[in-house]
Design a protein with these regions (language model features):
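Short runs within selected transmembrane alpha-helices of multi-pass transporters and secretion channels
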Residues: 74, 143-161, 169-177, 198-211, ...
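Small-residue hotspots at the loop-to-helix junctions and early N-terminal turns
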Residues: 50-61, 137-140, 199, 272-287, ...
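Alpha-helical transmembrane segments of multipass membrane proteins
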Residues: 36-40, 113, 121, 155-159, ...
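Short alpha-helical transmembrane segments in multi-pass integral membrane proteins
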Residues: 1-24, 81-148, 190-245, 303-368, ...
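Transmembrane helical elements of multi-pass membrane transporters/channels
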Residues: 19-38, 142, 176, 205-209, ...
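N-terminal transmembrane alpha-helices
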Residues: 8-48, 61-80, 105-112, 147, ...
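Helix-terminus/linker motif at the lipid-water interface of multi-pass membrane proteins
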Residues: 29, 33-54, 123-130, 186-193, ...
Length: 455
């Protein structure tokens, strides 16, 4: 690939989005497998598989926080780097890359120390029961040691994709996912390590992906190179990145808070089986959301570059294409989930009781998922044009203003089956949030475009 990204401003939008989004979508699907393959294997353990699956689900809020810190840096830094490249300032983009790299190392050290000290206390607070805490702590003790690999893989890979090297970004995830899929059964079943084996397989796989990313960013093919002289924190460089990445951090860390709220409420009203069902539902939700994010990540360099180049027509066109694609995908997947829920639950558990409970919850939890393409397309475009305040507003309203209170209100509104009522909080919040997002986006996007020449 040529060491320039002018094609982002010249190639036909349909062809360009296809070229960038397809590898990103594939990467996100692979990333989904990376994240849920542990659950699939663990759920089929011959002894205690359902409880082990529930224990792993209790770990997810902590894992989400680790990923959220990677997003704080990368989802702000990568678009800022793209905008700088659109202005022709590759040196400034490399300073952003170096600042983000060193900050992620610092964050990794802090997170690892905290998890090794307080993981059991956190897991008990996050919904672990006496029957599941052993499985949860066994997984988290090992996972914590690989925090630095998670941070650097997720964080630095965003800078590879932001340069237009979407296939290389896809390979990052592919390498880790294939490694994890191969190592999981070896450690879980072959070496009889159970959940600890799943965690060890994940850490080793992330380490391999991390090495791949760092070798690329230090190699000859990259446009932006990771340089030692840029690896020092500069407030003027890193603070704008953190401001823009705050929306992604809020979205992902709020997922952790939401997950804790779901787990504790479901444990109260439905016991371990309800928490186990939520583990399966969150896995299916990941299946739904990650490809949507892949579409957004494919469109993001196009929108950011052309916004930096002040090409209003291409910015509008890229958003419309992203919106249509997101709606088609979300609608098709919603239909499949509604018609064939058993196809999804069978992947995670052979336990008939857990499968039946999950299928009943699934139709409630995903009732309005077909609308969520609007939410993701608008959110990703806000980030791509550097509209940090709007991105934060959308994230805060959906998670904190709507979903979090509804998790606790719905059982009171529908007391007949309080456990199932908890799952209804998700579609109720999504319906209101999508409406709010669409209205806000129509106003703010118009203002942003009107500032560009020939708008």
């Amino acid at each position: 690939m040529e060491k320039n990204n002018q094609y982002l401003g010249t190639e036909p939008l349909g062809k360009l989005l296809f070229k960038l989004a397809v590898p990103s979508v594939v990467a996100q699907i692979i990333n989904m497998l990376y994240n849920i393959v542990d659950r699939i294997y663990i759920g089929h353990m011959p002894e205690g598989g359902s409880l082990a699956l529930t224990g792993l689900g209790v770990c997810m809020p902590i894992i989400m926080v680790v990923s959220a810190f990677a997003a704080l840096v990368s989802m702000g830094g990568a678009p800022r780097a793209s905008i700088a490249m659109g202005r022709g300032d590759n040196g400034g983009a490399e300073r952003i890359l170096g600042n983000c790299f060193i900050l992620q190392i610092i964050i990794s050290a802090i997170l690892t120390s905290a998890l090794l000290i307080w993981d059991r206390d956190l897991l008990l607070a996050f919904g672990a029961s006496p029957d599941t805490i052993g499985f949860a702590a066994g997984y988290m003790d090992i996972y914590a040691l690989g925090t630095i690999f998670v941070q650097l893989t997720l964080g630095m890979n965003a800078f590879i994709t932001a340069q237009g090297f979407s296939k290389t970004g896809m390979y990052t995830v592919l390498i880790g996912a294939v490694s994890n899929i191969i190592l999981d059964p070896v450690f879980i079943f072959g070496l009889d390590m159970g959940v600890r084996g799943a965690a060890l397989a994940t850490v080793i796989s992330q380490c391999i992906s991390c090495l791949w990313v760092l070798l690329f960013l230090r190699g000859e093919k990259t446009i932006l190179r990771l340089k030692k002289e840029n690896m020092r924190l500069e407030a003027g460089v890193i603070l704008p990145c953190l401001a823009l990445g705050l929306a992604a951090f809020i979205m992902q860390s709020s997922e952790s808070i939401i997950s804790v709220s779901f787990n504790t409420s479901l444990l109260k009203y439905g016991g371990d089986i309800a928490v186990g069902a939520m583990t399966i539902l969150s896995s299916i939700n990941m299946f739904a959301m990650l490809p949507l994010q892949g579409l957004g990540q494919g469109a993001q360099p196009i929108v950011s570059y052309n916004y930096g180049a002040k090409d209003a027509k291409r910015v509008r066109g890229a958003f419309k294409l992203l919106l249509r694609s997101s709606l088609i995908y979300a609608g098709a997947l919603w239909l499949i989930i509604m018609l064939f829920p058993q196809a999804f639950t069978g992947l995670f558990t052979p336990n008939a009781e857990l499968a039946a409970f999950t299928q009943a919850a699934m139709r409630r939890y995903f009732a309005v998922m077909f609308m969520f393409g609007i939410q993701v397309a608008c959110q990703m475009t806000f980030t791509a044009i550097g509209s940090a305040r709007s991105s934060i507003a959308v994230a805060v309203v959906r998670k904190f203003v709507l979903l979090l209170p509804l998790i606790y209100l719905m059982p009171a509104l529908f007391p007949g089956d309080k456990a199932m009522a908890v799952y209804l909080a998700e579609p109720a919040a999504d319906l209101i949030a999508v409406t709010f997002t669409a209205i806000l986006f129509s106003v703010q996007f118009k203002k942003a475009i009107e500032k560009l020449p020939n708008s």
